[in-house]
Structures are given as structure tokens and as C-alpha cells.
Design a protein with these regions (language model features):
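A contiguous active-site-proximal alpha/beta segment in oxidoreductase catalytic domains
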Residues: 4, 26-88
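Rossmann-fold NAD(P) dinucleotide-binding segment
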Residues: 5-23
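C-terminal helix-rich "cap/oligomerization" subdomain common to oxidoreductases
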Residues: 34, 229-267
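Mid-domain beta-loop-alpha active-site segment that forms a flexible
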Residues: 50-58, 87-125, 142-145, 244-245
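Oxidoreductase and adenylate-handling cofactor-binding alpha/beta cores
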Residues: 56-80, 106-135, 147-157, 258
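Contiguous beta-strand/loop segments that form the cofactor/metal-binding neighborhood of enzyme cores
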Residues: 114-194, 224-235
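Active-site loop of classical SDR/Rossmann-like NAD(P)-dependent oxidoreductases
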Residues: 215-226
């Protein structure tokens, strides 16, 4: 088994009868998305993207469990924040080339688009507005170091923001957060750090009519790997619906395209 990192590798693998789990973002253009969708439908193979800020974060998994149990009522809004550390000395040249990494919303915000759909209980959504910029790295003109987007479904709205501005003083690569608003309460995830608060990671705060509740989610089971292997064996879609997998990336690509209208990025 191998985690595939290139769209052409995903297509070739499916054409040779293999199921695929790709690193994010899976693809960087609509043409690649269309080709992967065509081959997936033609071959009947499973194509997945490892949206790790959901599938590999116990707090995000537990939030899904709580929402499924009705803990905050009906979800109406999400706010997903994905700050990252640039660490210039550890990045290859392609990282700063727009047509190779796909743009900041396509790349790291793909996590947030998937989570918006998942917590909304939706298979698809609409991008209302989006923006990208290079505010702090003029010597790297191909880099987009901040981006955001407003999104919605028929029942929910959301906001996504990603950046490469994590200060060196933070003891981890990013203060990733997610707030999920429901009709009967809300959940806040502090995924990787609770700044100047509780030690460790995977912090979940739940506010409902009974009060304020805290959960340390560090020991919550991560079911994605087990579910994905079950899907491979049984030809099911328990780990992630195929439609949602593709539509999260469609939203990311749509937001990227919308944000770049009228601009010209160094290639």
C-alpha cells in the first residue's frame, strides 16, 4: 500500500485495478479533477483523499460523534481556521510555484472545505466569495500566504481562513481551530494547542443548555483507516462518500479560481 501524491499516479493506479488514497489536495486543476472522476467512474475503483485535519484529528472525530448524537441540535454554521508554519528553510522549490502547489485554497484549505461539508451533513456546497494574497513574502511571488472563503449549502453557511503566518513562538505548526454552531449549542475545537491554557492537543469545548463542558479527545479512536480498508474489501463507502470526496476538492478549486480572477500569479 502506498499514499499517492500525483494525479497521474492516481489515474494509472485505478486503470491498473487499484483503489487509491491520495495525499491532499489530490489534484490542482479542474482538468485533473475531471480526469480522475472519469477514470474512477469507468473503473469502479475507490478514490480517496486523506483530509488529515479531519480524519487524523481525534477532536474532529469526536465532534462528529457528538453532532450525530444531537448534542448541539442542527448545524447552521462552521468557522474553520487552518494557520500553518512556513519554515522557509525546509520547503522545496515547487512549494513556491503556483502552478505546482495549486494555490493556498486548493492546497491547505481543502481540509476546511471537506470539514464544512461533513459537519453540515452535505455532499456539496457553494463558494460565495474567496480571496488570496501574498502579504508578507514579496521575495516569493508565487506563494500565496493567506486566503479565505465564504461557503454555504441550502441549510448552512461557513467561513474558511488559511495562512502561513504561524509565529515561531508557537510550540506547534499551527493553532488549528474549528467552531461549529448548532441550534442548541456550539462546539469549539482547539486541535493542536490550547494557547496558554490546557496542555497537549485535541481539546473540545461544548456549550449547551446545561453549561460548558470540556473533553480531552486525545484517546478517541480514529476510524478512517479501518473504515477505508473495509471499503476496499467490501466495496462500500463508510470512510468517506465518493461524492463528498470529489466535491470538497471541487469547492477548493472553485474558491481558488474565484480568488484569482483579475490577478496574475508568478508561475
Amino acid at each position: 500500500r502506498r499514499l499517492i501524491r500525483a494525479p497521474c499516479g492516481s489515474v494509472a493506479a485505478m486503470q491498473h485495478g487499484k483503489d487509491v488514497l491520495s495525499a491532499k489536495p489530490g489534484m490542482t486543476t479542474f482538468a485533473q479533477l475531471d480526469e480522475i472522476k472519469r477514470v474512477q467512474k469507468q473503473t469502479g475503483r475507490i478514490y480517496g483523499v486523506l483530509y488529515s485535519e479531519h480524519f487524523e484529528v481525534p477532536a474532529a472525530v469526536e465532534a462528529g460523534n457528538l453532532i450525530a448524537a444531537g448534542a448541539i441540535g442542527k448545524v447552521v454554521n462552521t468557522i474553520g481556521m487552518g494557520p500553518h508554519s512556513l519554515r522557509l528553510n525546509n520547503r522545496p522549490d515547487w512549494f513556491f510555484t503556483r502552478n505546482r502547489y495549486g494555490g493556498i485554497l486548493c492546497d491547505i484549505a481543502s481540509h476546511q472545505f471537506e470539514q464544512f461539508l461533513f459537519f453540515s451533513g452535505a455532499m456539496d456546497g457553494e463558494v460565495v466569495s474567496a480571496s488570496v494574497a501574498n502579504r508578507n513574502n514579496p521575495h516569493r511571488p508565487g506563494l500565496q500566504d493567506v486566503g479565505d472563503a465564504h461557503v454555504r449549502t441550502a441549510e448552512t453557511t461557513g467561513y474558511v481562513r488559511v495562512d502561513w503566518y504561524t509565529p515561531e513562538g508557537l510550540p506547534t505548526w499551527g493553532d488549528g481551530r474549528l467552531t461549529i454552531l448548532g441550534t442548541e449549542g456550539y462546539i469549539e475545537l482547539r486541535k493542536y494547542v490550547d494557547i496558554d491554557g490546557k496542555p497537549g492537543d485535541n481539546h473540545l469545548f461544548l456549550v449547551d443548555k446545561k453549561g460548558v463542558h470540556y473533553r480531552d479527545c486525545s484517546q478517541v479512536e480514529l476510524p478512517f483507516g479501518r473504515q477505508f480498508l473495509d471499503d476496499v474489501r467490501n466495496r462500500t463507502e463508510t470512510a468517506m462518500p465518493q461524492e463528498r470526496c470529489f466535491n470538497a476538492m471541487k469547492m477548493a478549486l472553485t474558491a481558488q479560481q474565484m480568488a484569482e480572477q483579475g490577478t496574475e500569479w508568478a508561475q
